[in-house]
Design a protein with these regions (language model features):
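Bacterial N-terminal signal peptides that target proteins for export
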Residues: 1-9
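N-terminal carbohydrate-binding/catalytic regions of secreted carbohydrate-active enzymes
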Residues: 77-79, 83-85
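Solvent-exposed, charged amphipathic helical/linker segments at domain boundaries
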Residues: 159-177
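An amphipathic alpha-helix/helix-turn recognition signal
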Residues: 75-76, 173
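Bacterial Sec-dependent signal peptides at the C-terminal "C-region" and cleavage site
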Residues: 16-24
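Bacterial N-terminal signal peptides
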Residues: 8-17
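Electron-transfer interface patches adjacent to heme c in soluble/periplasmic c-type cytochromes
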Residues: 23-74, 86-147, 154-158, 164, ...
Length: 287
C-alpha cells in the first residue's frame, strides 16, 4: 500500500507539476488555483470551499452540521472575547492596537508590512500589542492566544479573504518563498503540502479524507477534536495556522519550523492569498 501511494504521488507530480514550474504572477497563480478546484469539484459552490472536506463529502458534512448545533468551541470563544476586551495593567486593551478596534479585520491577514519588510500575522500582532502595553507574550499556537485570535476572526465571518501582494519585490519574495514551500517535498515520506491538499485532495489516507487547499485557511484559528482529546479545559481544542503546519510536518516526518517562523509566515501568506474571495468562517470545527 505504501509503495502504491508513493508511486501515485510521483506520477501525480510528474503529470501535474509542469505548469507550476513556469514563471507566473500571483494573480495568474490564483486564477489557475481556483480553476483547478472548481473543475475538479463542479458541484461545489465557490463559497462552500470554506468548509474543507465538508464541502465535498455529504456524509462528513452531515456529521459536521450536527456538531455545529452545539459547537464545542463556544465556551472557548467566549473566553477569547473576554480576554480581548480585558484591559491591560495600563488600562489599554487589544482594540487600541488594531484598525477598526480589531473588529472585522481578519480578512486582511497576513499582510506585507512595507516599513519592516516583514509579513505580519494576526497572532504575531496580538503579541506585539501585549509587549507594547507592558505585558508578557502569550504562547504561540494554542491556548489564550489562539482563543483571542479565534474571537477576532469570528467578527469577520462572512467577509471575504482579501490578502494583498503589493508591487514590492520584497513582498513577491515572501510570496514565492511560500509557494516554493507548498510544492516542495520534505520529510522521510518525501511529500509536499500539495501532494495531500492539491493533487490528492478528496482521497483517503487511512481514515482521513484529504481536504482541498482552496479555502484552507478561511476557518482558522480552528477547533480540532483531536487536540481537544489530548488536552484539558475549554481551550484545549484551539489552534492557529502555524500549529497545524507543524502537525503536517510531523505527519510526513519532517522537521517543523515553529510558530511565527519566516517559513511558516511565507506559507501562510501564499496559501491565504490562494483563497482570496472565500468567506471567513471561524473558528472551524475539524476532526
Amino acid at each position: 500500500m505504501r509503495r502504491t501511494l508513493t508511486l501515485l504521488f510521483c506520477a501525480g507530480w510528474l503529470a501535474l507539476s509542469a505548469p507550476l514550474a513556469t514563471a507566473t504572477t500571483p494573480q495568474e497563480d490564483l486564477q489557475a488555483f481556483r480553476q483547478y478546484f472548481q473543475d475538479r469539484y463542479p458541484a461545489t459552490p465557490f463559497d462552500d470551499f470554506q468548509n474543507g472536506i465538508y464541502s465535498i463529502d455529504a456524509n462528513r458534512r452531515a456529521e459536521w452540521e450536527a456538531m455545529e448545533e452545539f459547537p464545542p468551541y463556544e465556551i472557548g470563544l467566549e473566553i477569547g472575547q473576554q480576554e480581548f476586551e480585558k484591559p491591560f495593567a495600563n488600562g489599554q486593551t487589544y482594540a487600541s492596537c488594531f484598525k477598526n478596534g480589531g473588529i472585522n479585520i481578519r480578512q486582511h491577514y497576513p499582510y506585507f508590512d512595507a516599513a519592516t519588510g516583514d509579513i505580519k500575522t494576526l497572532e504575531g500582532e496580538i503579541n506585539e500589542c501585549r509587549v507594547k502595553n507592558g505585558e508578557e507574550k502569550l504562547r504561540f499556537g494554542r491556548g489564550k492566544l489562539a482563543a483571542i485570535a479565534a474571537y477576532m476572526a469570528s467578527t469577520s465571518n462572512g467577509s471575504r479573504l482579501n490578502v494583498v501582494i503589493p508591487d514590492d519585490p520584497r513582498a513577491l519574495e515572501w510570496y514565492n518563498r511560500g509557494k516554493k514551500h507548498y510544492f516542495a517535498k520534505r520529510g522521510q515520506l518525501n511529500m509536499s503540502c500539495a501532494d495531500c491538499h492539491y493533487y490528492y485532495a478528496g482521497h483517503n489516507v487511512r481514515a482521513d479524507l484529504l481536504h482541498p487547499a482552496l479555502g484552507d485557511l478561511s476557518h482558522f484559528p480552528v477547533y480540532r477534536k483531536k487536540w481537544e482529546a489530548r488536552g484539558s479545559g475549554a481551550l484545549a481544542g484551539f489552534g492557529t495556522t502555524h500549529r497545524r503546519f507543524n502537525g503536517c510536518n510531523e505527519q510526513v516526518r519532517a522537521k517543523g519550523y515553529g510558530a511565527q517562523s519566516d517559513e511558516y509566515k511565507a506559507l501562510e501568506f501564499y496559501l491565504t492569498f490562494m483563497s482570496n474571495g472565500i468567506p471567513i468562517n471561524a473558528p472551524g470545527v475539524r476532526q
